[in-house]
């Protein structure tokens, strides 16, 4: 993990609370100390934090996790306040700024909102801010019961194109048998995320405060692998676990993707999106895409055809109609009509704002 420069770190409820008696500020301080050290070493960091419901339960004096939706949502709303304040104050002690982001799965399934969230997160990371992400439990419906922050963390890893997803849990990793029942159980140090043999050993459920058992963690690793991210499922009670992972120590279970990041992303783009429009390119843009594999700039587009929204797939063709590439447009068809033929520096003048300097970024282009 020494070469991974963008990490998504997910910390479960059991590691942030004092045996269900509210947030453990000392434990959170230890986590922040480790994450601040990673930051100092040049790692771009996104934190997915559980604990809001558990913190709210403690404030309300509840000892058992309620099953009623409205009670869970009330606990989440109350606990989120203290959770964010605790992270903010702890990171401030190390000179680090934080930003709160509450997401639902709908935010990441709607392409326009997905792109907006991605732009915001990338900007925060580039500013050296640590985004603190949680599921917006107070407004979702069945997600609060069936959703989990392991899955959210994997989707965030896809969103920010992370190199590494670290899922910190109260177990040391994945075992070939349940270590609570079998003293001969062996830790699985490394495997492919898509290995079907892992399904048989990922049984069990989460604890009383959390929602995610090992099955959800395996599913999260497979989601993260779609964009080429590695996942480490590792015990959060291991001393200096993040620093030791950064140093290359073999801890927990490393689940690797089948393909590299770019190849996985290209396959996802090619296989899962329908085209919504066409961009007719000039000869210079055709050469820039086909030979130099550069991004598509507005200046190289002659004509916009069809109706598409920001984030939808469009076909890029040469003047003679030959298909050159496909990609995700950073602008809608209406916006693209206004900026084609102009330099990137002119986008603000034409639209009044600039979402991205490219019409299609090269990472979102597939040559055909």
UniProtKB/Swiss-Prot annotation:
MF GO annotations: ATP binding; glutamate 5-kinase activity; RNA binding
PROSITE patterns referenced in this protein's UniProt entry, alphabetically: GLUTAMATE_5_KINASE, PUA
Binding site for substrate: 50, 137, 149
One Gene Ontology CC term in the entry: cytosol
CDD domains in the record: AAK_G5K_ProB, PUA_G5K
Annotated localization: Cytoplasm
Keyword entries, A-Z: Amino-acid biosynthesis, ATP-binding, Cytoplasm, Kinase, Nucleotide-binding, Proline biosynthesis, Transferase
Pfam families attached to this UniProt entry: AA_kinase (PF00696), PUA (PF01472)
Record flagged with keyword Iron: no
Binding site for ATP: 10, 169-170
This protein's pathway: Amino-acid biosynthesis; L-proline biosynthesis; L-glutamate 5-semialdehyde from L-glutamate: step 1/2
Top enzyme class: transferase
Annotated ranges, domain PUA: 276-354
Classification via InterPro entries: AceGlu_kinase-like_sf, Asp/Glu/Uridylate_kinase, G5K_ProB, Glu/AcGlu_kinase, Glu_5kinase, Glu_5kinase/COase_Synthase, Glutamate_5-kinase_CS, PUA
Chief site of localization: cytoplasm
Reactions the enzyme catalyzes: L-glutamate + ATP = L-glutamyl 5-phosphate + ADP
Leader peptide range in chain numbering: none
UniProt EC number: 2.7.2.11
PANTHER family to which the protein is assigned, alphabetical: GLUTAMATE 5-KINASE, ISOPENTENYL PHOSPHATE KINASE
Function: Catalyzes the transfer of a phosphate group to glutamate to form L-glutamate 5-phosphate.
Family membership: Belongs to the glutamate 5-kinase family.
Protein name in the entry: Glutamate 5-kinase
Species of provenance: Pseudomonas savastanoi pv. phaseolicola (strain 1448A / Race 6)
């Amino acid at each position: 993990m020494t070469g991974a420069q963008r990490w998504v770190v997910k910390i479960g409820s059991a590691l942030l609370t004092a045996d269900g008696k509210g947030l453990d500020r000392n434990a959170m301080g230890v986590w922040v100390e480790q994450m601040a050290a990673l930051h100092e070493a040049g790692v771009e960091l996104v934190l997915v934090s559980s604990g809001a419901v558990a913190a709210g339960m403690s404030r309300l004096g509840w000892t058992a996790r309620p099953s009623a939706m409205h009670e869970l949502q009330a606990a989440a709303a109350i606990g989120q306040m203290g959770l964010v304040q605790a992270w903010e104050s702890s990171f401030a002690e190390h000179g680090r700024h934080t930003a709160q982001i509450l997401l639902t799965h709908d935010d990441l399934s709607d392409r326009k909102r997905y792109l907006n969230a991605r732009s915001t997160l990338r900007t925060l990371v580039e500013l050296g801010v640590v985004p603190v992400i949680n599921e917006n439990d107070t407004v979702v419906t069945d997600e609060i019961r069936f959703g989990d922050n392991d899955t959210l963390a994997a989707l965030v890893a896809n969103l920010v194109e992370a190199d590494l997803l670290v899922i910190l849990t109260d177990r040391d990793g994945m075992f070939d048998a349940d270590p609570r029942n079998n003293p001969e159980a062996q830790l699985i140090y490394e495997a492919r995320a898509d290995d079907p043999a892992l399904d048989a050993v990922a049984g069990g459920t989460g604890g009383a405060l959390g929602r995610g058992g090992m099955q959800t963690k395996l599913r999260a690793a497979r989601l993260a692998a779609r964009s080429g991210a590695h996942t480490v499922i590792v015990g959060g009670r291991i001393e200096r676990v993040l620093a030791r992972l950064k140093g290359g120590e073999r801890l927990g279970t490393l689940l690797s993707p089948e393909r590299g990041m770019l190849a996985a992303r290209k396959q996802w783009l090619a296989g899962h999106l329908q085209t919504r429009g066409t961009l007719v390119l000039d000869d210079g843009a055709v050469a820039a895409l086909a030979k130099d594999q550069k991004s598509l700039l507005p200046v190289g587009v002659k004509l916009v055809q069809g109706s598409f929204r920001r984030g939808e797939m469009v076909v890029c063709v040469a003047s003679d109609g030959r298909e050159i590439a496909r990609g995700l447009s950073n602008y809608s068809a209406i916006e693209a009509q206004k900026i084609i033929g102009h330099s990137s520096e002119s986008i603000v003048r034409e639209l009044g704002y600039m979402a991205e300097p490219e019409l299609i970024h090269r990472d979102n282009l597939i040559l055909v």
